[in-house]
């Protein structure tokens, strides 16, 4: 009996639980579930069968006790969440009996949402929204806590119906009760941060109405409450970048960049936001509570090496849909800024943060999400200030690269490439500040011994050469560490490497042309750059296997360092201790130094006005200044300020003229101070003093674009001056460019190729525009220069090829000369197919005779050089066969199945000049068998230069044999019936050994017998030579020739693989034809 009662009670409990939670047979009830069930059962027992008045009276008595008050409140909440019909009446009952302003109900509802929202039934979730609306409507205290936890349950990367319902329901509450929302600044910040993040996931056309509602609400709230939005800081900017192509957000971006005061009087622009570290509570609100618990467990309880099964579970649970990839950025930002392990954990065998982040990045297969994940990893580097930022925020970035370089070099190389390019292109206007942030990060990493040194990473042989060069350009202060001298890695005066101008399309972020209107914008690394791009401009990241165990880095934390400066940032993150003792040895900008009177005034004016006129005036004074007039400190001061001003005054985009013809655009494009230096050098070619040479050397070394901008300047300057004074000729002075090369102590050829390579990468159109001038003015260097040729070939399309050929045809451009062209072609054999086809088009445009390149014929292989062979075959078609061409052609290696190139050439020549071709080949074959030594082959002497390209008798016979096989049905067989070929074949037969006779028996069978030679198995007659036939026998001779031809046709109509015995059946008994006089080679 007791067992039956227990079973009934269990069934009753399960029935009650099933109303609120989705349970399975294996689920065990936890404390929260039992608490709600117990409260509901207790309430039902107390009010069962009572009228409303009786119920209110008895409950009023019970709620006087604290425990019973909580139990009754939870019981009512249970009814509201499970019974929609009774919810309004129950809510009125709560208001009557509650004695704490519903504080207990709100607290328990907050706990329920945070811990059990995923297990709530659909009815319970809908009733949750209903009760929240009632709470907000009646302004119940602390309801914002429930709202905030509901916002957390609105997960990113989730477009399921369940999640979309929650998102839209919360949005409707915010819109309807906007006035209440604005009374809570933290909830305003959380809702804006959350919805800007969620809008990114709602790009599907099916969600357009929801997305438009979200955009309208979010933009309105941002603009109306921008003073509450400012504390969201730099991560809010990161989220805004992902939605920047939506028209409403595009307008917001323009106000942030160009009209910040219109948003709020205290707002100073984008850098104002980027300097504020985002509070970890906002980063936390973008993770589901359950996901946060799993992540904490992974980072605090799982041993390194045992993490794979947990990662697989996490992957299947949260990354199962295409939309879920965007969640990786949220996870990485949370790990970096919220999960800060203690020193004990760092020294333990628990999986480190960098390994989790490495797994998140390497397992991402979506290119946009992958780029955003990398940005999330390095985001704090870009704005790092040692005085107030935590080293724990930059530590994972360096460790994931450092530990991956050995076993996963692809991960390290892609991250390094991303870091280099984002440093230049994230915010070009403030590149110096961004670069300083990255410099501070790397310096603190070394100071705190996060890793011993950067050399194993930056100089790893597993990085390709281009990436190592990029690292040297961006982090030259850290590239060459010296053993036992760590301070040598940090120069006394910090210099910031100048940016290399990227193509204009790569410089749209945070500039005049910032973004396109549209949806679904994303941060993508393109051609190695980081920017807002269209959806079709992506980089695919291949997934890698999970990170394997490697040696961990042990480094000291900053928690024991005393704090000596107040953290001015208003944040509730009390464990982010400022590192005030970590300082740069010197400030980036040197302090003012007194200069000699000769230059002090002009330099001060230049520093103040920063224009070309004041710059040239200073150069005029500085050029003649002797070395003794300046000490090292003064010279460094001049150089540092000069380089900084020259770089800052150059435009960040559109550095070249918009038009190649209009004077105003041309003049404007060379009006900047750097061009003033070029103008000064152009007009003053006399040798200058050492300080000026040092200044010039430093400018060229730090501003890598100096060389190609000088070439551009000379083109424009000569063009403009010639228009002003047509009677005077203005030269494209190569001497000025030589000065630049001498200043960098490099050969002019090396400098020219490097500068033109940079120019092509910056702007292909300008590169091709300058090309004729380069080949004209630097002809000794440029003509037949394979490196310059490769730069040109890699960037041209069909229209460019056409324009270059126009210039060649008009005599404006000469790329090749005959001497040395052969070497150019040999180097080009490794180029891409399209590049080789373009090359041959240009060679053809130069009217290069075949004799200049015919030496290539024996070298080319059919399998490896199809492009060159195709064009050479076309050239051969336009030529008559000569002794030299045939010699080279037949020198080609004859494969077992023949050489189609040789066969093709012989075939089309046979159609035009069969007899001449036959005589040339016959003469070549005959020359291999001297009459003085009938049984030995003639071998070329060791000193003969033509030995390597002179065909042997076997070569010639091989090609003739393969040609014979190609002649089906008697076509083309006339090559063998001419007198000289007949004699040559007979001579070859008589001088060949038995194996050769057997190998070429079919070929030798084509030769008619004469009186002195027997071919094949035919016996000789032993008779002397006949007298030539007279005119009266001419008809007989013609008949004989015809019969001979018929025999040849009969032979070729048979199977080409016939045996020697088969050939012996064809007896050729005609007398030999009248011999023609041998043709001289000169013919």
Swiss-Prot record:
Residues in the signal sequence: none
Predominant location category: nucleus
Start-end of Basic residues biased regions: 1066-1077
Keyword hit for Phosphoprotein: yes
Pfam families (alphabetical): HEAT_Ints3_C, Ints3_N
Domain of life (superkingdom): Eukaryota
GO cellular component: cytoplasm; nucleus
Localization, UniProt: Nucleus; Cytoplasm
Ranges of Low complexity composition bias in the record: 942-953
Claim: Transmembrane is one of the keywords in the record: no
UniProt keyword annotations, A-Z: Cytoplasm, Nucleus, Phosphoprotein
Region (Disordered): 551-579, 929-953, 1014-1083
Modified residues (Phosphoserine): 1053-1054, 1058-1059
Subunit structure: Belongs to the multiprotein complex Integrator, at least composed of IntS1, IntS2, IntS3, IntS4, omd/IntS5, IntS6, defl/IntS7, IntS8, IntS9, IntS10, IntS11, IntS12, asun/IntS13, IntS14 and IntS15. The core complex associates with protein phosphatase 2A subunits mts/PP2A and Pp2A-29B, to form the Integrator-PP2A (INTAC) complex.
Function noted in UniProt: Component of the integrator complex, a multiprotein complex that terminates RNA polymerase II (Pol II) transcription in the promoter-proximal region of genes. The integrator complex provides a quality checkpoint during transcription elongation by driving premature transcription termination of transcripts that are unfavorably configured for transcriptional elongation: the complex terminates transcription by (1) catalyzing dephosphorylation of the C-terminal domain (CTD) of Pol II subunit Polr2A/Rbp1 and Spt5, and (2) degrading the exiting nascent RNA transcript via endonuclease activity.
Family classification: Belongs to the Integrator subunit 3 family.
PANTHER family, sorted: INTEGRATOR COMPLEX SUBUNIT 3
Protein name: Integrator complex subunit 3 homolog
């Amino acid at each position: 009996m007791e067992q039956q009662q227990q079973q009934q009670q269990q069934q009753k409990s399960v029935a009650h639980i099933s109303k609120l939670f989705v349970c399975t047979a294996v689920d065990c009830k936890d404390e929260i579930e039992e608490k709600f069930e117990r409260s509901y059962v207790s309430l039902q027992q107390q009010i069962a069968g009572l009228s409303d008045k009786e119920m209110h009276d008895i409950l009023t008595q019970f709620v006087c006790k604290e425990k019973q008050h909580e139990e009754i409140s939870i019981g009512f909440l249970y009814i509201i969440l499970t019974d929609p019909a009774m919810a309004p009446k129950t809510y009125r009952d709560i208001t009557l009996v509650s004695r704490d302003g519903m504080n207990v109900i709100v607290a328990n509802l907050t706990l329920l949402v945070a811990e059990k929202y995923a297990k709530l039934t659909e009815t319970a979730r809908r009733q949750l929204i209903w009760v929240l609306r009632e709470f907000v409507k009646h302004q119940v205290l602390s309801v914002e806590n429930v709202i905030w936890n509901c916002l957390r349950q609105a997960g990113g990367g989730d477009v399921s119906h369940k999640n979309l319902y929650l998102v839209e329901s919360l949005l409707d509450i915010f819109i309807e009760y906007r006035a209440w929302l604005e009374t809570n600044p933290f909830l305003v910040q959380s809702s804006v941060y959350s919805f800007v993040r969620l809008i990114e996931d709602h790009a599907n056309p099916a969600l357009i109405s929801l997305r438009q509602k979200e955009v309208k609400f979010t933009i309105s709230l941002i603009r109306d409450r921008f003073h509450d939005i400012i504390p969201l800081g730099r991560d809010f900017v990161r989220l805004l970048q992902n939605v920047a192509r939506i028209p409403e957000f595009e307008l917001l971006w323009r106000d942030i960049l160009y009209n910040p005061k219109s948003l709020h009087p205290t707002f100073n622009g984008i850098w104002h936001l980027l300097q504020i570290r985002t509070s970890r509570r906002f980063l936390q609100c973008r993770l589901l509570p359950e996901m946060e618990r799993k992540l904490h467990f992974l980072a605090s309880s799982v041993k390194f090496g045992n993490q794979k099964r947990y990662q697989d579970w996490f992957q299947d649970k949260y990354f199962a849909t295409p939309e879920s990839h965007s969640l990786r950025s949220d996870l990485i930002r949370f790990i970096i800024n919220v999960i800060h392990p203690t020193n004990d954990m760092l020294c333990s065998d628990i999986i480190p943060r960098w390994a989790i982040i490495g797994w998140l990045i390497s397992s991402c297969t979506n290119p946009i999400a992958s780029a955003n994940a990398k940005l999330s990893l390095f985001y704090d580097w870009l704005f790092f200030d040692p005085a107030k930022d935590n080293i724990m925020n930059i530590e994972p970035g360096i460790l994931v690269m450092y530990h991956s370089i050995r076993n996963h070099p692809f991960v390290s190389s892609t991250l390094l490439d991303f870091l280099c390019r984002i440093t230049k292109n994230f915010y070009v206007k403030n590149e110096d500040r961004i670069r300083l942030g990255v410099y501070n990060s790397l310096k603190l990493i070394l100071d705190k011994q996060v890793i011993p040194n950067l050399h194993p990473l930056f100089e790893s042989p597993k990085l390709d050469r281009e990436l190592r060069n990029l690292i040297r350009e961006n982090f030259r202060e850290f590239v060459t560490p010296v053993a036992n001298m760590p301070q040598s890695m940090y120069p006394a005066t910090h210099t910031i490497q100048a940016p290399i101008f990227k193509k204009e399309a790569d410089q749209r972020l945070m500039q005049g042309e910032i973004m396109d209107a549209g949806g679904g914008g994303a941060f993508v690394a393109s051609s190695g750059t980081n920017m807002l791009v269209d959806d079709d401009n992506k980089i695919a990241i291949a997934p890698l296997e999970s990170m394997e165990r490697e040696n961990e880095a042990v480094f000291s934390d900053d928690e024991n360092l005393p704090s000596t400066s107040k953290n001015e940032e208003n944040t509730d993150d009390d464990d982010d201790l400022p590192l005030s003792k970590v300082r740069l040895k010197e400030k980036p900008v040197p302090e003012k130094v007194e200069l000699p009177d000769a230059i002090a005034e002009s330099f001060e004016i230049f520093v103040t006005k920063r224009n070309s006129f004041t710059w040239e005036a200073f150069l005029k004074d500085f050029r003649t200044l002797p070395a003794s007039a300046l000490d090292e400190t003064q010279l460094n001061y001049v150089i540092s300020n000069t380089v900084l001003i020259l770089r800052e005054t150059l435009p960040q985009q559109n550095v070249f003229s918009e038009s190649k013809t209009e004077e105003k655009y041309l003049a404007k494009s060379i009006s900047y101070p750097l061009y003033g230096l070029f103008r000064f050098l152009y007009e003053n070619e006399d040798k200058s003093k050492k300080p000026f040479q040092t200044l010039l050397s430093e400018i060229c070394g730090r501003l890598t674009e100096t060389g190609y901008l000088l070439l551009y300047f000379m083109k424009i300057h000569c063009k403009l001056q010639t228009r002003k004074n047509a009677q005077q000729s203005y030269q494209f002075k190569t001497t000025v460019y030589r000065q630049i090369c001498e200043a960098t102590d490099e050969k002019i050829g090396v400098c020219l190729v490097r500068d033109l390579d940079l120019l092509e990468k910056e702007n292909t159109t300008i590169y091709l525009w300058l090309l004729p001038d380069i080949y004209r003015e630097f002809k000794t260097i440029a003509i037949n220069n394979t490196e310059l040729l490769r730069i040109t070939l890699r960037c041209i399309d069909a229209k460019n090829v056409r324009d270059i050929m126009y210039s060649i045809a008009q005599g404006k451009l000469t790329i090749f000369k005959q001497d040395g062209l052969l070497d150019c072609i040999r180097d080009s054999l490794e180029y891409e197919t399209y590049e080789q086809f373009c090359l041959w088009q240009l060679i053809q445009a130069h009217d290069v005779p075949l004799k200049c390149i015919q030496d290539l014929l024996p070298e080319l292989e059919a399998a490896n050089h199809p492009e060159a062979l195709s064009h050479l075959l076309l050239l051969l078609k336009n030529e008559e066969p000569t002794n030299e061409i045939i010699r080279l052609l037949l020198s080609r290696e004859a494969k077992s199945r023949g050489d189609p190139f040789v066969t093709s050439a012989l075939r089309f020549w046979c159609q035009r000049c069969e007899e001449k071709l036959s005589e040339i080949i016959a003469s070549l074959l005959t020359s291999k068998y001297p009459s003085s030594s009938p049984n030995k082959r003639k071998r070329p002497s060791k000193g003969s230069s033509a030995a390597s390209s002179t065909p042997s008798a076997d070569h010639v016979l091989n090609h003739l044999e393969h040609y014979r096989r190609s002649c089906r049905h008697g076509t083309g067989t006339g090559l063998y019936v001419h007198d000289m070929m007949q004699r040559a074949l007979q001579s070859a037969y008589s001088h060949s050994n038995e194996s050769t006779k057997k190998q070429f028996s079919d070929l030798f069978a084509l030769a008619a017998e004469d009186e002195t030679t027997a071919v094949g198995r035919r016996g000789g007659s032993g008779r002397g030579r006949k007298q030539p036939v007279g005119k009266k026998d001419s008809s007989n001779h013609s008949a004989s020739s015809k019969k001979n031809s018929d025999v040849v046709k009969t032979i070729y109509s048979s199977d080409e693989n016939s045996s020697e015995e088969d050939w012996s059946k064809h007896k050729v008994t005609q007398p030999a034809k009248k011999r023609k006089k041998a043709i001289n080679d000169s013919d």
